[in-house]
Curated annotation (Swiss-Prot):
Protein's name according to its UniProt entry: 3-keto-L-gulonate-6-phosphate decarboxylase UlaD
Organism field: Escherichia coli O17:K52:H18 (strain UMN026 / ExPEC)
Keywords carried by this UniProt record: Carbohydrate metabolism, Decarboxylase, Lyase, Magnesium, Metal-binding
Binding annotation for Mg(2+): 33, 62
GO molecular function, one term: orotidine-5'-phosphate decarboxylase activity
Example GO biological process: L-ascorbic acid catabolic process
Positions bound to substrate: 11, 192
Chain coiled-coil ranges: none
Length: 216
């Protein structure tokens, strides 16, 4: 089983704030995510600028595309994104359109599982050639005190068994990682637990060490 990658979510509102994070921890992570908040605040230039600074890193545009899949994904890929996200409630043709464009750029599409979705949809995504999903505990659910539970672990295992590369996100803390041991997680996303740490560098390194210990 290969080691899960570590992704930092830049849900900053400005590029200046995002740069404060990347200057410290870009070399400690595998993937730099231009979070939805940053995408809205700064547009696709955030993707372009971060990829220019870190060409050796995977840069994800977390656009959460809900419609106009070809147009929006092309905007992201032309800004040199490696991956883009499509929200799970989008029509299957939106996901297909985004994937078609991704292939032109040797990129990839992730389905963001935020909110309601079904296993029938999951099968449609697989049938359409989608390889990646993001299992997401929402920011608002976290704020309401919703913790990771057995239902989450069961769903993640089932998605993996279907052949998806599964990314896990949603207020992920270091102590949560052992919950997922034994599952071939593709990526773990950490946002505030790295960005807001007293030492973001050490926080990122602790995540990497824990991943190596649990999956190595």
């Amino acid at each position: 089983m290969s080691l899960p990658m570590l992704q930092v979510a830049l849900d900053n509102q400005t590029m200046d704030s995002a740069y404060e994070t990347t200057r410290q921890i870009a070399e400690e992570v595998d993937i730099i995510e231009v979070g939805t908040i940053l995408c809205v605040g700064e547009g696709v230039r955030a993707v372009r600028d971060l990829k220019a600074l870190y060409p050796h890193k995977i840069v994800l545009a977390d656009a959460k595309i809900a419609d106009a899949g070809k147009i929006l994904s092309r905007m992201c890929f032309e800004a040199n994104a490696d991956w883009v996200t499509v929200i799970c409630c989008a029509d299957i043709n939106t996901a297909k359109g985004a994937l078609d464009v991704a292939k032109e750029f040797n990129g990839d599409v992730q389905i963001e599982l935020t909110g309601y979705w079904t296993w029938e949809q999951a099968q449609q995504w697989r049938d359409a050639g989608i390889q990646q999903v993001v299992y997401h505990r929402s920011r608002d659910a976290q704020a309401a005190g919703v913790a990771w539970g057995e239902a989450d672990i069961t769903a993640i295992k089932r998605l993996s068994d279907m052949g998806f590369k599964v990314t896990v996100t949603g207020g992920l803390a270091l102590e949560d990682l052992p919950l997922f041991k034994g599952i071939p997680i593709h990526v773990f996303i950490a946002g505030r637990s790295i960005r807001d740490a007293a030492s973001p560098v050490e926080a990122a390194r602790q995540f990497k060490r824990s991943i190596a210990e649990l999956w190595g």
